[in-house]
């Protein structure tokens, strides 16, 4: 099986009913704790606003946020981390009317209320300590 190059960038068009599906494995990092980061950018560059930011700190927490006008907004933390080092994961981010619904391996973990409309998202980037099998956008709900 071939893996995707990390960081992985994907041009997208999101709307209510879209689902971002990310499959991969967190890989051990001897420098620090393994991490996974997913960013939904409003332009095709990393300096743009971030409508949704998800960062997994393995064994500690999951952080969700947005970046508006170059400033990080109020961080939302989840102290339940449903990812395991070296084990495959299936991360799904559903675009709902009012929020992004986040599921890991079929388990609902969080709803992040939209701060920037999902229709503004132009690019998704997935990176950090991860081996990626696939990243795709499904425009049907499930």
From Swiss-Prot:
Entry annotated with the keyword Magnesium: no
InterPro entries: ConA-like_dom_sf, Galectin-like, Galectin_CRD
Domain Galectin: 6-138
Tissue expression from the record: Predominantly and highly expressed in the placenta where it is localized mainly in the syncytiotrophoblast and in the endothelia of fetal vessels. Also detected in the amnion and chorionic trophoblasts in fetal membranes.
UniProt keyword annotations, A-Z: Apoptosis, Lectin
GO molecular function: carbohydrate binding; lactose binding
Pfam families, sorted: Gal-bind_lectin
Gene3D superfamilies linked: 2.60.120.200
Function, in words: Binds lactose with high affinity. Strong inducer of T-cell apoptosis.
Protein's name in the database: Galectin-16
Gene that produces this protein: LGALS16
């Amino acid at each position: 099986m071939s893996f995707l190059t990390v960081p992985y960038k994907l041009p997208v068009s999101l709307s209510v009913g879209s689902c971002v599906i990310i499959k991969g494995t967190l890989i051990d990092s001897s420098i620090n704790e393994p991490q996974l980061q997913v960013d939904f950018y409003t332009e095709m560059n990393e300096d743009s606003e971030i409508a949704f930011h998800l960062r997994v700190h393995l064994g500690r927490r999951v952080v969700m946020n947005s970046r508006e006008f170059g400033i990080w907004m109020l961080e939302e933390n989840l102290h339940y981390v449903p990812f395991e080092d070296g084990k495959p994961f299936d991360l799904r981010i559903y675009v709902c009317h009012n929020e992004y619904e986040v599921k890991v391996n079929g388990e609902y973990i969080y709803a992040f209320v939209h701060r920037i409309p999902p229709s503004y998202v132009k690019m998704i980037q997935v990176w950090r300590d991860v081996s990626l099998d696939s990243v795709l956008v499904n425009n049907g709900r499930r």
